[in-house]
């Protein structure tokens, strides 16, 4: 039978399940909402939905990259514990999903969840199966795909917890990977000073000026002190101004010039960003690893 949008809406309101799951259950039960709920409980969908409110701050970051390094996708998949995150089933799910995103040029998470994972099963179907089987909430939180016509995409993943993609014009694969590792370690705010958010600049100017004015020095001296403070700040938060972690005698800008290369764009994900959880300084781990190479 044809399932009306109103029936699907009612079932979603009662179960919290996704639209496709509700439509499928209603179709199989000829529009009987109570029977559909019972069916969803039997198949694990209802069990999965009960876990949907639990915080999934652990997980993994995975990358799919084309053989010619012209295209790459970075995806964050979440679960509740590190134990499950390292399990074969979760890793297989994340790995197959990121490949699907890149191969099908999927645009957003909603489209990904509705995409075919395997014959007769969507990505969200598989996600809910794993939730029901393993007993933890799981989510496909975000992903990004970079493509390059004239350059290459470099990538670096640290411990499945920090992931970086870098689009580089000029240079080679080794340089692209080095830049990606550097971004993982230093977490720059912007590629160049001109790209820094104006509200960030205004706030930093205000803070430093207020501090320097307490010295009682003349205005022109305070202006010089402020200029120096902002220059130091740029060396810390602007990618091109930062010192290369593998060679602190050289800035990223100088490194690029020596290879006649240009960074077009970069993306950095850190697992669980914005999710309330116990923090671990994985960036410091990358920094130590990079300096040791």
Curated annotation (Swiss-Prot):
It comes from Dichelobacter nodosus (strain VCS1703A). Disulfide bonds: none annotated. GO terms for cellular component: cytoplasm. One of its GO terms (molecular function) is translation elongation factor activity. This is Elongation factor Ts. Keywords: Cytoplasm, Elongation factor, Protein biosynthesis. The keyword Protein biosynthesis applies. Its main location: cytoplasm. The keyword Membrane does not apply. SUPFAM superfamilies: Elongation factor Ts (EF-Ts), dimerisation domain, UBA-like.
